């Protein structure tokens, strides 16, 4: 068994490590780098993301045909390990949850039309996204089969009724993937933050920092 990384991946790994050391880790000791929820502040994030793009390290998990690096699991693991040496790392490379998982889902199953409208803006860093799945008890948490939110088709449109919580990034997201029950089972719906009929009731505090995580 060969435990060595291919040369092209190892070069990207080293490049990622050097970028994190030079541009990201030093920010952790600067109080103004943080927002009120202990994430990297949005202005600084935008600046670092521009540098990542210039270095050719943006969205390594996305196919080259959609402006990513097109890495497979081994390459992604190598680069993600380096990014996660900083709590700010994953989000700077567009590799933080929930965007990371949402991009993967959309790239796998969305139609081309849906990809252009919903996926590409996330890939480009123009918008952020969230996954609305978890519900208060007795609704679905880690078990989606328990989801209580219902969607019914009425007069040519879908009407969704339910309550979700612990929706990571909902406050800054523009694109949402929402899971609801239909007569055929669970269905994932795409919606934009500006669509009417929904609202955020409150931000739920948690124990510890809310820093962006990576997969």
PLM regions and their residue ranges:
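Flexible, small-/acidic-enriched active-site or ligand-binding loops
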Residues: 146, 196-215
């Amino acid at each position: 068994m060969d435990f060595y990384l291919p040369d092209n991946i190892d070069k990207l790994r080293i490049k990622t490590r050097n970028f994190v050391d030079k541009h990201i880790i030093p920010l952790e000791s600067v109080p103004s780098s943080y927002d009120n929820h202990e994430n990297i502040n949005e202005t600084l994030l935008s600046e670092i993301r521009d540098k990542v793009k210039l270095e050719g390290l943006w969205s390594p998990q996305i196919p080259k045909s959609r402006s990513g690096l097109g890495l497979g699991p081994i390459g992604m693991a190598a680069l993600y390990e380096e990014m996660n040496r900083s709590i700010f790392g994953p989000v700077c490379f567009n590799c933080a949850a929930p965007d990371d998982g949402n991009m993967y889902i959309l790239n796998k199953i969305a139609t081309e039309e849906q990809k252009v409208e919903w996926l590409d803006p996330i890939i480009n860093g123009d918008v952020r996204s969230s996954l609305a799945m978890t519900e208060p008890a007795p609704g679905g948490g880690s078990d989606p089969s328990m989801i209580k939110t219902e969607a019914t088709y009425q007069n040519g449109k879908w009407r969704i009724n339910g309550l979700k919580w612990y929706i990571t990034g909902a406050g800054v997201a523009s694109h949402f993937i929402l899971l609801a029950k239909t007569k055929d089972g669970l269905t994932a719906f795409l919606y934009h933050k500006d669509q009417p009929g929904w609202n955020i009731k409150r931000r739920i505090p948690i124990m510890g920092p809310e820093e962006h995580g990576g997969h």
